[in-house]
Design a protein with these regions (language model features):
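An acidic helix/loop motif centered on a single conserved Asp/Glu
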Residues: 48-65
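Hydrophobic membrane-insertion alpha-helices, especially the h-region
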Residues: 1-14
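Cleft-lining beta-strand/loop regions that shape enzyme active-site pockets
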Residues: 7, 17-29, 33, 37-45, ...
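PDZ/PDZ-like peptide-tail recognition elements
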Residues: 56, 68-106
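Polar, glycine-rich mid-to-C-terminal structural blocks
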Residues: 286, 298, 305, 309-373
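Conserved functional hotspot residues or short segments at active or partner-binding sites
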Residues: 339-340, 344-513
Length: 513
């Protein structure tokens, strides 16, 4: 039997050897992929989804390059580009999902939802004919159901008090803001929080900074923590606002891309403003271009923790079916000549966890630097390449507040649900408040400490001793006030103003005056 089987195998091999040799002559390395997909389509034993196989093949091929060269199917590509476009077609609300029901956090002024009467604090029960409340409906699926071409209609059913109210909403163009907050911390210090580098970043930042200048700003704290990047040109425009004429911002170079230098034009309105930039382990890409340019030109102070370490530039390649590839075409280099791209490795995506394990998040001395990648700033200070921007002033992760009570509340999102419950209770009053002093007085009257402890106990079964509450409340109370204050007319500005009381990195920046 063994001999017979062996003979059959040899026969099967020889039967196609001539055709295989012929095919070998007809294709080179880069045509193999097309050829094998064609052969699968024509000759595979079972019916298959060729598109699915093609997508998998492209994804596998790009995985051999670098972590940021990626294939994106049509839906994913559309969502990614919409996120950076500065606007999208939808109904015009912001919401969060503190438990299993979406709560309207913001109704965009002048948007479709405001026009029909949706209100902050409404609970979203249905979108179209689909129940989305109480069923742990995926948040990205909620967003997809609410979005759609401008001019189309969707019915959104909300819960308001004891009422269930359906609203027919005609979708429209909705602005997506990248400046999350902008305000004066004191008489001379302004603060701007930027969430991403979108198409509208330069416009939004210019408007915010002009307002702060008019209010007496002499120093700016620019918060790029958790900003994962976006459009390269927007980072250049922001650098231009701070740097003097001829200062180098960045240069790019790749095997098939000649060296491109980018220098400041000297027309920026913030050249004489003291600057502090806040970064952390999730500050990446275009944010690192900005931070690197400021650091290498000795233009400002970088405070926080080592940034992500993405020093690669991608260009889009679009296909007719709506899918596309983001292909790495160059590396970018800061003015001193350093590339801040961290090494590729099998555990690349787990680098942040490794930093925690190695102690880097708690101790500046644990930051691993490559002594062979040392460079000099304009003033002669030593900086390092090879893995993110290392801040001038290190601020560790604060672990002193992690009591059992606080951790238990975080796991169940008790704080967010409490804030939503407080808004339901005090909706008419909170919705009217539009100044900081009035909001502070109202929050004091709400007796948040006892209200929260009662809520945590009755809703989530989480209790604490008086001693544990005292250890926790110094950090937890400002957070609760910020979450409730966000429901006022002051919105995100109220949140960040109140939260800065427990933001150790921001406190360090203020102290650096």
């Amino acid at each position: 039997m063994g001999i017979v089987v062996g003979a059959l195998i040899v026969l099967a091999y020889n039967a196609y050897s001539q055709k295989r040799n012929m095919l070998r002559v007809q294709y080179g390395d880069w045509r193999k992929l097309n050829l094998i997909l064609d052969q699968i389509d024509k000759n595979y034993v079972d019916t298959i989804n060729v598109g699915k196989v093609t997508d998998a093949a492209i994804t596998a091929a790009l995985a051999e390059l670098d972590p940021h060269s990626v294939y994106m199917p049509p839906v994913e590509l559309t969502e990614a580009e919409t996120d950076l476009a500065g606007n999208f077609d939808g109904i015009g609300i912001q919401f969060n999902v503190p438990n299993d029901t979406a709560i309207v956090l913001e109704v965009i002024p002048g948007g479709p939802s405001e026009k029909v009467g949706l209100q902050k604090g409404d609970r979203i029960l249905k979108v179209g004919d689909k129940d989305i409340a109480g069923v742990k409906f995926p948040q990205d699926s909620m967003v997809r159901r609410m979005k759609g071409p401008a001019g189309t209609k969707v019915t959104v059913t909300v819960g308001r008090g004891n009422e269930t109210i359906p609203f027919e909403i005609t979708r429209g163009k909705i602005p997506m803001h990248c400046v999350d907050a902008s305000f004066m911390i004191n008489d001379t210090t302004g603060y701007i929080k930027l969430s991403k580098f979108s198409r509208t970043t330069f416009t939004e930042f210019s408007q915010a900074s002009a307002t702060l200048l008019g209010e007496g700003m002499k120093k700016l704290i620019f918060d790029l923590r958790d900003n994962t990047g976006g459009y390269f040109d927007q980072a250049l425009l922001l650098c231009d606002m701070f740097l003097k004429k001829g200062d180098e911002i960045v240069y790019m170079q790749g095997l098939h891309r000649k060296k491109d230098d980018y220098k400041a034009d000297g027309k920026g309105i913030l050249q004489d403003i003291d600057l502090t930039v806040l970064i952390n382990e999730s500050t990446a890409s275009s944010s690192e271009i900005f931070a690197g340019a400021i650091q290498d030109n000795d233009r400002g102070l970088i405070i926080g923790r080592r940034s992500f370490g993405k020093g690669l530039v991608q260009e889009p390649v679009y296909f007719s079916d709506g899918s596309g590839v983001r292909l790495t075409v160059a590396r970018f280099y800061t003015p001193s000549g350093r590339c801040i791209q961290k090494p590729y490795s099998e555990d690349y995506q787990y680098d942040i966890y490794k930093r925690y394990a190695d102690g880097e998040m708690y101790d500046a001395d644990s930051i691993k630097v490559d002594s062979t990648a040392a460079y000099k700033t304009v003033a002669g200070r030593t900086v390092y390449g090879g893995g993110g921007i290392i801040p001038d002033v290190f601020v560790p992760v604060d672990t002193t507040r992690a009591t059992k009570f606080y951790i238990a509340c975080n796991k169940k999102a008790t704080q967010m649900r409490f804030a939503s419950a407080m808004f339901d209770k005090y909706k008419s009053r909170l919705s009217e408040i539009d100044n900081d002093a009035e909001l502070g007085i109202f929050l004091d009257r709400m007796n948040i400490p006892s209200a929260f402890r009662e809520y945590a106990s009755s809703k989530d079964g989480i209790t604490c001793t008086q001693k544990e509450w005292e250890e926790t409340s110094e950090y937890l109370l400002p957070q609760l006030r910020a979450l409730v204050g966000r429901y006022s007319k002051l919105g995100e500005n109220a949140f960040y103003k109140m939260y800065l009381n427990v933001d150790v990195t921001l406190k360090k920046a203020i102290e650096s005056d």
